[in-house]
């Protein structure tokens, strides 16, 4: 049996006296997909930043691709796709990808950029500055940037936020493609419908704890919704 792509044990993250994550246990098999739901302040983005190696746990353990999440070996295997505003607005689409490729020591960042722009349907706007893109186009460029080093594990923070229906459908299809490619996908979202359709499993965070976890699917949607609403009520 393959080792888990992600393993967390008694994971905690504190900011001063505030506990953002408390005693989180998590195991994500390689090539699987997980949706993480919860109200604002539940700890979703904090968890994702820990998985990306952008922040260190206060206590507990967190291994990604067989290494501590903040180790260079783990970070090289992870693609973090945050909000599209993380793009460089004055750089062209291609320049954004080439720059990211160089940061990740991609051998031929220009060729890799061209491949990704084609895959994301952005080949016709390769020279346009990212700041001129619609929300949907910017999200596609953000995904391309997150994939520039061909990561095994893809982390997405609220990618459906602000998208129109057409762009959201295209993104959902892209997530399914990433899954079929054998990548491990972790999706943070408020969107119950997307959480169910885009992942093998789902969990709900409430005040930094895992309040509920289940296999995703139509049969678990109602139970997942109840857990999400309970977490939202608890946060008020």
Model-identified regions with their sequence ranges:
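Helix-to-loop junction immediately C-terminal to a conserved catalytic motif
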Residues: 52
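Conserved ABC transporter NBD signature motif
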Residues: 60-70, 74, 212
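Conserved ABC ATPase "signature" region
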Residues: 98, 102-125
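Conserved catalytic motifs of ABC-family nucleotide-binding domains
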Residues: 150
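Catalytic Walker B motif of ABC-type/P-loop ATPase nucleotide-binding domains
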Residues: 154-157
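Helix N-cap at the start of a conserved alpha-helix in ABC-type nucleotide-binding domains
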Residues: 165-167
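H-loop/switch region of ABC-family ATPase nucleotide-binding domains
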Residues: 189-190
């Amino acid at each position: 049996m393959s080792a888990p792509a992600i393993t967390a044990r008694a994971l905690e993250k504190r900011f001063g006296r505030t506990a953002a994550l408390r005693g989180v246990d998590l195991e994500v098999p390689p090539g699987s997909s997980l949706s993480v739901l919860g109200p604002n302040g539940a700890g979703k983005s904090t968890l994702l930043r820990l998985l990306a190696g952008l922040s260190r746990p206060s206590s507990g353990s967190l291994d990604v691709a067989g290494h501590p999440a903040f180790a260079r070996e783990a970070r090289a295997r992870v693609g973090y796709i945050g909000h599209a505003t993380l793009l460089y607005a004055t750089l062209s689409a291609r320049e954004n990808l080439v720059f990211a490729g160089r940061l990740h020591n991609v051998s031929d960042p220009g060729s890799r950029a061209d491949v990704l722009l084609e895959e994301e349907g952005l080949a016709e706007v390769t020279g346009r500055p990212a700041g001129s893109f619609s929300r949907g186009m910017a999200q596609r460029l953000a995904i391309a940037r997150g994939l520039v080093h061909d990561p095994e594990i893809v982390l997405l923070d609220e990618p459906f936020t602000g998208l129109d229906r057409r762009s959201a459908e295209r993104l959902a299809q892209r997530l399914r493609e990433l899954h079929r490619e054998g990548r491990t996908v972790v999706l943070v979202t408020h969107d119950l419908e997307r959480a169910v359709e885009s992942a093998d499993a789902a969990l709900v965070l409430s005040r930094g704890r895992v309040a509920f976890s289940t296999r995703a699917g139509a049969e678990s949607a109602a139970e997942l919704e109840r857990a999400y609403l309970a977490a939202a009520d608890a946060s008020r």
